[in-house]
Amino acid sequence: VYLLILVVLAIPLGNYIGKVMNGERVFLSKILVPCESFIYKVLHVDKNEDMGWKKYSFSIIAFSLISLVILFFIHLCQGFLPLNPENIKGTSLDLAFNNAISFVTNTNWQAYSGESSLSYFTQMIGLTVQNFVSPAVGMCVLFALIRGFFRVNAKGIGNFWTDITRSILYVLMPLSVVLSLVLVSQGVVQN
C-alpha cells in the first residue's frame, strides 16, 4: 500500500514542487505569498536576484555554518536554556560537534539517547529546526544543479534565499502538517 501511494503521488507532487521552485502560483499561494513576502522583507532578500554559482554556493555554506554553530552551542548550553525540567547538562564538546554536523548535513546520526541526553529545547529548537532546514538546503542544491544544466546561457542559477524559503514554506511545512494528521488519525503517540 505504501509503495502504491508513493507511485501515485510522485508525479503530482513532483509537478507541484517544480512549480513552487520556479516561482509559479500553486493552490497554497494565496495563503503563503504574504508569509513569503514578509520573510523576504524581514531578511532584506531580493527574491528576483539571480545568483551566480559562486554566490549561491557561498550562501549555502554560510547558512550551513551558521546553523552548525548555533546548534553546537545549543547542545553545549542546554543546561542553562529553558524547557529543561530534568536539568540535563550540556553535552560534551565532541558529542555537540558530532550532533551538529550530523543534523546540519541531514544524516541525523544520533550517538546518544535523546530522551535522557537532550532537553526539550535542544530537541525542538535545535534538532527539529534542522530537520526542516537541512532537507531544504538539499532541495536548493538539487534545483540549483538542475537550473545549471538547463540555463546554459544564463548567468545565474536562482536565489538560495528564495529557494530555501519556498522549499520550507510550500513543500516541507505542508507535507509535515498532512503527514502529522495522518499519523494522529492512526493513533501514533504524541509525546
What kind of feature is each model-predicted range?
Residues 82-127, 189-191:
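P-loop potassium selectivity filter motif centered on the GYG triad
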Residues 1-98, 142-143, 150-158, 162-191:
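N-terminal alpha-helical transmembrane segments of multi-pass membrane transport
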Residues 12, 100, 104-111, 131, ...:
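Functionally constrained cores in energy, signaling, and assembly domains
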Residues 5, 115-147:
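Pore domain of cation channels
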